[in-house]
Curated annotation (Swiss-Prot):
Stated name of the protein: Nuclear egress protein 2
Perinuclear space membrane side: 1-245
Ranges facing Nuclear side: 265-276
Organism name: Human herpesvirus 6A (strain Uganda-1102) (HHV-6 variant A)
Membrane spanning stretches: 246-264
Modification after translation (UniProt): Phosphorylated.
Keywords: Host membrane, Host nucleus, Late protein, Membrane, Phosphoprotein, Transmembrane, Transmembrane helix
Amino acid sequence: MANVLKEKMYDELLSATCRILKLGSHDYRITERNLLSKNPKFPLCDIILKLDYAYNLEYLLSLWEHVTKQEPRFVFKNTGGAVSMSCYLHAPVKVEGHHAVRECNILRVNECLTVRMSDIVAMKPSTFAVFTKCIIRRNRDDTYVVEFVAFGPENESEYISLLKAIFLKKCSMGKQHLESNRFCQGLRRRSSHVLEKGRFESSGKVVNKASAVVTSQESIKQFYEKEKSLLSGVKFWRLSERHCRFALVGICFLLALYFCYVLLKKTPTPASGSVV
């Protein structure tokens, strides 16, 4: 079970280191687990650091210390063409150089600088400062500068009072936010109540509109029937007018024939023979 935990710790430290330092596949070299099990004072990994890049060194050291419950050490070495950083879980067997860690450290060829968490804390202006970052810069010739940048207040009490003021401001803003949320909830409830009333009223209006539509349709039908009856009456009147005209013409013709017949009957007819 202990070996499984060690393997998990090994994988966790490597993945966290690559993630925090944003390393590529060609930027580091890993020591095998078998060698670490035989000699735990070997470095877990060796990293080639880039120039003018800010590495979150304190965050990585604090994470290693939290995971391993030990005091890890990061050893910077000038290899001549670059600066490498070897990450140790335990103190290395041979430490090359015993430089005191400062904000700016000059490394000549083959010189080393060992950094622990206590060294970073000692450089910080306050314990509650922002995480310290490490930057590698090229100096004259083949020398490099390992610079540790730490931001923080010089007066601890002022920093604590500032944090308290920020906390109180956030608390007051949180209370205002809660009150505004309650007010908004009340408005939402009122608006929902008004909307429900509006829905009921609108449903009544819809029913009234539907009845009005029905009545309007009935009135349209009645009007159409009336118009239809009127049109039929007009048509009948026109037909009856035509028939009356024909009847009058026929009566006049018959009267003319009768008048002619009477005239012909009254006129005397001449005698057919001579009178003696």
